[in-house]
Structure formats: structure tokens, C-alpha cells
Amino acid sequence: NDLPMHLAVGHWILENGQVPNVDPFSATGHGGPWVAHEWLAATLFKSVESLGHPNFLIALAVLLSASLGGLLELIQRSFGVPAFWRLLLLVPVWLAVGRRLMLRPHLLALNLVLLVWWITRHGRPSPRWLWVLIPVMTLWANLHGSFLLGIAYIIGDLCIFSQGHTLPRKQRFMIAGGSVLATLVNPHGVALYLFPFQLALDPVFTAGVFEWLPPWTAPGFMTTPAAISGIGLFSLALLGSALQGWGSENSGLRGLLKRPGFALSLLAAVTATFLASRQLRHLALASLLWAPLIGVLWGTLNWRISPSLQKAALAFPVALVLLLGFQGYPAGIDAQGQWRWRSIGSGWSPQTPVIPIDTLVNQWEVSGVLLCEYEFGGFTSYISGGKLRPTMDSRNTVYTPEFFLAHEAALRGENEELRKTLTEKASAILVHPGKPGRRSL
């Protein structure tokens, strides 16, 4: 339900030639202040779709997913991770990351996380590369709210954990300061800095949306390949650290922490793991950050690996390709205890409300207010081109938590006053008949 909202926002921006600072879509939040923090991603998505076929969006998702793999390979090589460990980690890393490889702004943000990481590493022997961080941070601030992570990492790498940098201290501080100032180049100014906290600390949405739940409380998540692989990666990190031991001046963890960039990278991976323990949506980030570090932890143990075993490691990427080719990787276990496979297809899923909304707008020529589920709001704004204005959508910063709960209560029939108000305003009603109280509408 997020991609259609981004496409609607991108369409509005391209049509009006500006970034909205008030909500132009909702019937109940219409005209209220709104920080369109992912406006550039929305414009990109809509521009790609406008090339002529929705499958161009799928191609963009494939391209961004592939670039993640390319950047991760560059980072692992910069750490000196042996090919054996790079191959061995392919399957668990990409099974853990796979469920987040969807076309949403966070896919761009994951690429930028790895890009900043690689630039800070490559910038040690080639300091001119560090100046690229400034335009990268301008781009990041307009694509996704996670740009604050980039600011923190750049300051940490250039100003605190600066071992191995050949650029003079003054210039490093200039780049760090320039990277911070670069994020102010956005349509919302300093308001953009508050938005990520408003989004992440909303108690209503974080408790009601699957990806914002802790892994162990999200229904069925702990049996998915993503969760199993994530646990496996974290276990490898812990075991590798234990086998390393604290060590001496030049060995063990003590020696690794003195390597350029390793200490900050380890701190970033631990932080991402903590975030993933709070909200499962961060599992992909944690897995990507741990992959090179696990390779370092195990690759520096100086264990002798026979050539035949090294060749056997090639079986892992081959197995991954075969697994992905067989109708997609397993998405979970069904009620009968069988693996549920993802099916291959294109276009919008029939489980989405595309057909009923298209019928309302293009066949029945309905316009005005649409009383609907929050997950239908983005589709409504996108498909109707603004002709229908939903009473609720997934942009939690447009609505207060109190109104979101009241809207849900009205749909269930537990808030008669608001239900009456909304139905009187509505030109049409689109609800999920399987949810409580909907059939009475």
C-alpha cells in the first residue's frame, strides 16, 4: 500500500511543479501540514512508470537490488574478506535481506547506506572521494528519512574513528560539516529533521503495522527464512567474536578494532541489530552491515581451508540461484505446515483494490470522498488521480494517532457519531468485508 501513495505523490509533483507542504489527497487531513520527506523517491518512481509500462518499476527494483549486491561486494573486498567467506555468506545474507527488496524509498536508502560506507573506506587511500559525501547526503535527505544515520556515520568516521585517513583533520571536519549542511537543501528545511522521530515513535502505527513490530511478536515471522537467516548471521558474528577472543596488541578483537574503520563498522552493526530487535524492518540493514564483519571475524582466524572445500563454497550461490528460480524463495509455512512459495507474476496483485477503485472512477464515474480502509487510501489517490479523496491512508504523519483509532472504531461500528459523519460525506464506501463491523456499512 506504500508504492501507490508514492506514485500519487510523484504524479502530483510532476503535475504541479512543486513539492507539497500541505496534504493534497485526504478527505479528513486535506489542507493540513505535511512533510513529504520522500518526495524525490516518489518523483523517480512516477517518472519511471511514465516511461510506458508498469514493469519498468519492476526493472528499477531489480537494478537497485543488484546495486546492493555490487556495493556489498566492494565493501567486503575493501575489508579483505576472502572469496570463500563471501560465497559462503551469500545465501543467508540475501535470504535475510530478500523480503525488503521491494520498490519503496528504503531500497534507495539501503543503497545509500552502503555507498557512504564504501566511500569512507575508499576515501582512506583516495581522499578526494570523501568530498562526494556532500552531494550524496543532499540526495539522501530528499529520498528517505534515514539520512540521519548517514550524518552520524560520517561524523563518526571522519571526526572520531579516523584511523587510516590521510586527509588532514581540518579538511575531514569540513567534509563532515558540509555533509550536515547539505541535508538542509530540501523543501522542508529543519522540519525534515523531526519527521523521522515523529514517524518511528508513533505508538499506534508501530503497534499495528507488521514491519514495525519486534521480530518475536510479529505473527509467523520467526518461521520465515529471513528470520532464520538473520539469527544464523548474528550467531556467526557472536561465535566469530568468541573464537577471536580479546587477543593481544595485533591479534584477536583488540587487533581488529585497531584496523581502519572496523570499530565504527562494528558499532553500526550492533546498533542496527538493536533496531532490528525492536522493529523487524531493520533486519535487512543489520544483515548487510554484519556480512563484511563476519567475513573479517572468521577470515582472520587463519584456519586452513582445503581447496576442495573452497570449491564447494560455489554451491551456495548456485543453490541461491536455483532457489530463486523455483517460483521465488519460500515466504513462510502455511497452516498445514508446508512451505508457501512465492509465485511469479507481474502487475498489481489481485489482492489489492485496484479493480474496485478503477470501477468506481472510470466506469461509475464516482468522485469526492471515499470512506475506506487505511491500506486502501494510497491506491485510491493513485488510481483516481485525485478524483477520490480517501478518509484514511498509510501516511501516519497526516493523521493523529487518536483520529486513526477513531476511524478504525467507526469502521467497526464502535464510534457511531464519526461513522455517521463519514458516511454522510462519502460518495462511496470501500472496505474489507472480512474485518469486524464492515458488512453493516
What are these model-predicted stretches?
Residues T359-E402, S427-G434:
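Short periplasmic/luminal acceptor-recognition loop of GT-C membrane glycosyltransferases, typified by
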Residues A59-F79:
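Transmembrane-helix motifs of polytopic, lipid-linked glycan transferases
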Residues Q310-W364, E375-G377, S384, R395-N396, ...:
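Membrane-proximal, lumen/periplasm-facing interface regions of secretory-pathway glyco-
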Residues L14, V19, G145-K258, S287:
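Transmembrane catalytic cores of multi-pass membrane glycosyltransferases
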Residues H122-T138, R169-I175, R259-A269:
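Short hydrophobic alpha-helices at membrane interfaces in multi-pass membrane enzymes
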Residues L71, V93-A96, L108-P125, I154-L158, ...:
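Specific aromatic-rich, kink-prone transmembrane helix
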Residues I383, E402-L441:
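Periplasmic/luminal catalytic loop of GT-C fold multi-pass membrane glycosyltransferases
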Residues P92-V97, W129-G145, Y153-I154, G178-T183, ...:
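Membrane-interface alpha helices of multi-pass inner-membrane proteins
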